């Protein structure tokens, strides 16, 4: 009798845990697993075990594994594409200041998560439907940058090439895992601005860039270390 009561209590506790789990809980775990272990390890049974719930509770939130995959891609698009578009559209006094605004995405991983981006690209190599989503996202990002250059008077073809250069350079660094020491990387900032825009940054631009690096890169890291 006591044993059956204990089992009933455990079952009720498990059901309570499952009821408290949200769609976002499953999605967060799926994205974390994608980044750490790849898409093959994004399995319903494995995730249910990590969450300490029954496999069936997954279906309270998603119709299928494919529905989860779709939600993962939607989340990636929201996290890694929308901020680029917003920064590219943000008003600025000149093109150098506009590009510094875009640099915020490369400095702040809450605006652009490079590990998630690379994980999705690896997934895309194995799934044509994912590759189509990635290709479309790349096109949207480049087009936002192209329109940014157009606003500052660049000819159409030059605006496209500069947009591609700005975007492909950064994605290429992530793909190659070319992670220099921050001090070294940031020391090249003014030169990158010159290459990307064809214009020399002045003291005002250098101060803007330094402020951006401090606020978006160093300050958040110091805050995390102080906790």
Regions found by a protein language model. Name each.
Residues 2-13, 89-107, 139, 200-203:
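Alpha-helical bundle regulatory/interaction domains
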């Amino acid at each position: 009798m006591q044993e059956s009561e204990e089992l009933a209590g455990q079952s009720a506790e498990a059901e309570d845990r499952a009821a408290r789990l949200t769609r976002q809980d499953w999605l967060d775990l799926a994205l974390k697993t994608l980044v750490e272990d790849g898409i093959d390890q994004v399995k319903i049974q494995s995730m249910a075990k990590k969450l300490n719930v029954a496999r069936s509770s997954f279906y309270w939130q998603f119709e299928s594994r494919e529905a989860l995959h779709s939600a993962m891609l939607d989340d990636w698009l929201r996290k890694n594409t929308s901020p680029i578009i917003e920064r590219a559209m943000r008003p600025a006094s000149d093109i150098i200041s506009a590009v510094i605004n875009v640099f915020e995405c490369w400095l702040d991983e809450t605006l652009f998560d490079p590990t998630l981006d690379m994980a999705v690209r690896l997934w895309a190599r194995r799934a044509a439907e994912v590759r189509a989503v990635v290709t479309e996202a790349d096109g949207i990002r480049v087009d936002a940058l192209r329109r940014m250059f157009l606003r500052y008077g660049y000819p159409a073809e030059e605006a496209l090439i500069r947009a591609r250069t700005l975007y492909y350079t950064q994605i290429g660094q992530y793909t190659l895992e070319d992670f220099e020491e921050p001090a070294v990387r940031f020391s090249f900032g003014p030169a990158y601005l010159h290459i990307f825009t064809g214009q020399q940054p002045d003291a005002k631009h250098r101060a803007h860039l330094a402020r951006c690096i401090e606020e978006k890169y160093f300050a958040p890291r110091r805050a995390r270390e102080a906790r």
